[in-house]
């Protein structure tokens, strides 16, 4: 008898082991993950030579020593609806990770149930349809009551849930990096609009100076015409000039209004609480880039960090999809009381205990698991390719913005020389007027070329400031990848 029981136990063990080993669906096709760009590929072309400088610092705008700009950016970062939306995406990603993690933990629930039923005289429980109190049967109506604790645990031996949780945590880390990218975009957007407005204020001042010079010329020519000393052609020429300047003044004032309204929307100001922006001089800008990019660029660009985490999350999703091919094990248990008579429910004899280990073997699924794995792998490879292109685009941004800024610096040096040359001519005209060699009109009009060249210099300075902010943004704006969020 004992030998027979041992034989049966051995047979069951052999069959169970064989089923465990072979009891999984066949992975028909799974391509390898695409390669990510290597750090040595993250560099500028050899023929691009730019000035060397350090990486931008956090809160880079404070180095510009402009209280107005600082207040605008602080207000934007504290009240932006776009940033609030990004932070809500963080919370959503965190809740999704918590939800998946909770599903892999021990689940315990209290259970209470009443079941009023009529037992069929022709069913499996037909004997209980009789009314025989002596036998403990008072059918056909019964009220079954059940109370107790129900527990379940998925053992997750192959990491289906574990990989899914890791993917959700990766998505949460990506959301954190995306929030930093939104903050960077908002700060740089405010700074660019702010300095565009400052440049417009300075342009308006130069145009008004030009208007005053030409207005003097108009009055001088008008006086000469009135005294018969000059034909009307110079007068009408000066009138055309002043009208052209007036047109430019109107355009610049309109541009100031447009920029202010764009800034109002970006900082989240209402119709009556937009802070007054006073004119200030444009700042000196940093024109260099770090000596090397490589890993540093990946760690300092929040958008690249977000993409990297999405890639990692996609690889974890592939691991989860592969684990679905293997057997899954779970354990369910119940401990409580069950009785078909309410008055006996809480008696010792009503105790019930169930222990239910379970095994699920994916043998034939019509290709569902393979289709899921193939789609998940394709999505992961797409994310890797998108990441690779994003890295190349980031290097391109640094190269293009750095080159543009260096070109603007060279142009500014030449334009500064032109301004100085016209100023020399103006000073010569004023000296000639002081010696009585030329008229006051000629000395005054000598100011016009200087103003024109100063406008050109202002436009270059404005573009340099905007371009330097764009370069700073392409270098990450002081962002550094911090500690990652891990499973609690």
Curated annotation (Swiss-Prot):
* Entry keyword Lipoprotein: yes
Q: Name one GO cellular component term.
A: transporter complex
Mind telling me what this protein is named? Answer: Multidrug resistance outer membrane protein MdtP
Q: What does the record say about its membrane topology?
A: Lipid-anchor
Protein family membership: Belongs to the outer membrane factor (OMF) (TC 1.B.17) family.
Task: Supply the source organism's classification.
Answer: Bacteria, Pseudomonadati, Pseudomonadota, Gammaproteobacteria, Enterobacterales
Per the UniProt entry, the signal peptide is: 1-23
Which residues are listed under lipidation as N-palmitoyl cysteine? 24
Task: Look up the domain of life of the source.
Answer: Bacteria
Its BP terms in the Gene Ontology are: response to antibiotic; transmembrane transport
- InterPro entries in the record, alphabetically? OMF, OMP_efflux, RND_efflux_OM_lipoprot_NodT
Lipid group attachment sites (S-diacylglycerol cysteine): 24
Q: What is the role of the protein in this entry?
A: Could be involved in resistance to puromycin, acriflavine and tetraphenylarsonium chloride.
Keyword set, alphabetical order: Antibiotic resistance, Cell outer membrane, Lipoprotein, Membrane, Palmitate, Signal, Transmembrane, Transmembrane beta strand
| GO terms for MF | efflux transmembrane transporter activity; transmembrane transporter activity
Gene transcribed to yield this protein: mdtP
Compartments where located: Cell outer membrane
Subunit arrangement?
Could be part of a tripartite efflux system composed of MdtN, MdtO and MdtP.
């Amino acid at each position: 008898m004992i030998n027979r029981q041992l034989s049966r136990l051995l047979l069951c063990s052999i069959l169970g082991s064989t089923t465990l080993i072979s009891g999984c669906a066949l992975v028909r096709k799974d391509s390898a993950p695409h390669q990510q760009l290597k750090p040595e590929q993250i560099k500028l072309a050899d023929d691009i030579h730019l000035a060397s400088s350090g990486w931008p610092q956090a809160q880079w705008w404070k180095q510009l020593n402009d209280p107005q700009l600082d207040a605008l950016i602080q207000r934007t970062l504290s009240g932006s609806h776009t940033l609030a939306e990004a932070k809500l995406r963080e919370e959503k990603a965190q809740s999704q990770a918590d939800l998946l993690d909770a599903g892999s933990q021990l689940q315990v629930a209290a259970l209470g149930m009443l079941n009023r039923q009529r037992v069929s005289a022709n069913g499996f429980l037909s004997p209980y349809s009789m009314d025989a109190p002596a036998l403990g049967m008072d059918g056909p109506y019964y009220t079954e009551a059940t109370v107790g604790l129900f527990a379940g645990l998925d053992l997750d031996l192959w990491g289906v849930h574990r990989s899914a949780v890791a993917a959700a945590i990766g998505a949460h880390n990506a959301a954190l990096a995306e929030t930093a990218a939104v903050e960077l975009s908002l700060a740089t957007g405010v700074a660019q609009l702010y300095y565009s407005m400052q440049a417009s204020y300075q342009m308006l001042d130069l145009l008004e100076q030009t208007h005053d010079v030409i207005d003097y010329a108009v009055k001088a020519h008008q006086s000469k015409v009135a005294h018969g000393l000059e034909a009307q052609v110079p007068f009408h020429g000066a009138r055309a000039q002043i009208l052209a300047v007036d047109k430019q003044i109107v355009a610049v004032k309109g541009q100031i209004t447009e920029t202010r309204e764009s800034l109002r929307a970006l900082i989240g100001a209402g119709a009556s609480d937009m802070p007054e922006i006073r004119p200030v001089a444009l700042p000196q800008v940093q024109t260099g880039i770090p000596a090397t990019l490589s890993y540093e660029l990946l760690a300092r660009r929040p958008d690249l960090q977000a993409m990297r985490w999405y890639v990692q999350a996609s690889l974890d999703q592939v691991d989860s999809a592969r684990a679905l091919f293997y057997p899954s094990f779970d354990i369910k248990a119940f401990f409580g009381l069950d009785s078909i008579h309410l008055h006996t429910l809480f008696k010792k004899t009503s105790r019930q205990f169930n222990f239910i280990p379970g095994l699920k073997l994916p043998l034939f699924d019509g290709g569902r698991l393979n289709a899921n794995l193939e789609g998940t792998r394709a999505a992961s490879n797409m994310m890797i390719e998108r990441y690779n292109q994003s890295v190349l685009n980031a290097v391109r941004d640094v190269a293009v913005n750095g080159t543009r800024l260096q070109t603007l610096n060279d142009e500014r040096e030449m334009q500064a020389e032109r301004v100085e040359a016209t100023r020399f001519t103006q000073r010569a005209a004023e000296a000639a007027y002081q010696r009585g060699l030329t008229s006051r009109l000629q000395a005054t009009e000598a100011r016009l070329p200087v103003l024109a060249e100063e406008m050109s210099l202002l436009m270059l300075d404005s573009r340099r400031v905007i371009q330097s902010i764009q370069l700073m943004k392409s270098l990450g704006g002081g962002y550094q990848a911090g500690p990652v969020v891990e499973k609690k």
